[in-house]
Amino acid sequence: MAKPLNERFFIPHEIKVMGRWSTEDVEVRDPSLKPYINLEPRLLPHTHGRHAKKHFGKANVHIVERLINKIMRSGGSHYKVAGHFMRREHRSLNSKKVKAYEVVKEAFKIIEQRTGKNPIQVLVWAIENAAPREDTTSVMFGGIRYHVAVDISPMRRLDVALRNIALGASAKCYRNKMSFAEALAEEIILAANKDPKSYAYSKKLEIERIAESSR
């Protein structure tokens, strides 16, 4: 007679991200971002691009995987931080998901050591604090172009927050002995605490200030 399934195989009672951190108690306070921050229990945050060609498919990608995807990008040639092409310093992560996964995992360990809290919860707080609510767009009236303030959709708010967190981490370790994992951990912690030293949080304040002046 065959043994029961739970005796033949190890079946965990709770699935934890990267085998270490649970998402059950992670809380999203921002009601507009809540539907788009995916916190489904997932051992390995890797969907192999199955949502890439689906409209709004990013909403089904785990938030940790979206962070991993952001740090893999080399950035556009026109994008600068403090006058330098910061993202190019970490082109070794470009399209290398396993390496980017290990960087994020190491950053989460550092966050856990420094704060004593679940790093996924700290990441969610950082995203909420770094997501701008307003931005500017250009419209043309009578052949003259004007900048006007517009509300930002929740999906774009999340994209901008993750992009600026990744850029801030790159800026912190640019020409510095600090590792990328340490810089990423520091940027997430600073953004979660609304510290002006955080690139992502200060960038959010700048975007909203420009939008307010364009009303």
UniProtKB/Swiss-Prot annotation:
Gene3D superfamilies: Ribosomal protein S7 domain. It comes from the Archaea. One of its GO terms (molecular function) is rRNA binding. It holds the Pfam family Ribosomal_S7. CDD domains: uS7_Eukaryote. Part of the 30S ribosomal subunit. This is Small ribosomal subunit protein uS7. It comes from Pyrococcus furiosus (strain ATCC 43587 / DSM 3638 / JCM 8422 / Vc1). The gene is rps7.
